[in-house]
């Protein structure tokens, strides 16, 4: 069984700390975009372990419920694999996906990468029906 370690302790191309995407011409790591979108009740980026009240959509600056963060995180990985289809193909050569940091937060990069490998188009279509994506499109 081939296992892909999806963290900074494994193949860094599959780590949210190293995988980079552009939003409105600004390139940052997936982790940076994700953390920057989180806000506390005062609209500030919350400190580590602090409660997230809502998110700010970096595509348009709109305030969205914190529940949209998972779809945003998935969207970031979809953007990454859309610009790096060779990495998605490479990941298809693995049977399992692990993240040694799994369980420390609600979103797990290994789970998202596994979902992308299993059904990239289906996952992309699911995100396109989400509240987060509809907000991006102004609907």
Where are these regions (language model features)?
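N-terminal accessory segments that precede or flank the first globular/catalytic domain
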Residues: 1-35
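Active-site nucleophilic cysteine motif
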Residues: 102-116
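Long, contiguous internal "core" modules enriched in hydrophobic/ aromatic residues
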Residues: 39-101, 116-136
């Amino acid at each position: 069984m081939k296992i892909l370690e999806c963290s900074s302790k494994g193949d860094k191309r599959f780590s949210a700390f190293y995988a980079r995407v552009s939003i409105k011409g600004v390139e940052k790591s997936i982790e940076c975009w994700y953390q920057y979108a989180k806000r506390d009740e005062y609209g500030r980026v919350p400190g580590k372990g602090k409660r997230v009240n809502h998110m700010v959509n970096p595509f348009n600056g709109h305030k969205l419920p914190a529940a949209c963060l998972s779809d945003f995180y998935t969207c970031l990985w979809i953007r990454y694999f859309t610009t790096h289809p060779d990495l998605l193909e490479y990941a298809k050569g693995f049977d399992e996906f692990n993240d040694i940091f799994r369980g420390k937060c609600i979103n797990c990069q290994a789970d998202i990468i596994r979902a992308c490998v299993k059904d990239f188009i289906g996952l992309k279509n699911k995100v396109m029906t989400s509240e987060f994506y509809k907000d991006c499109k102004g609907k």
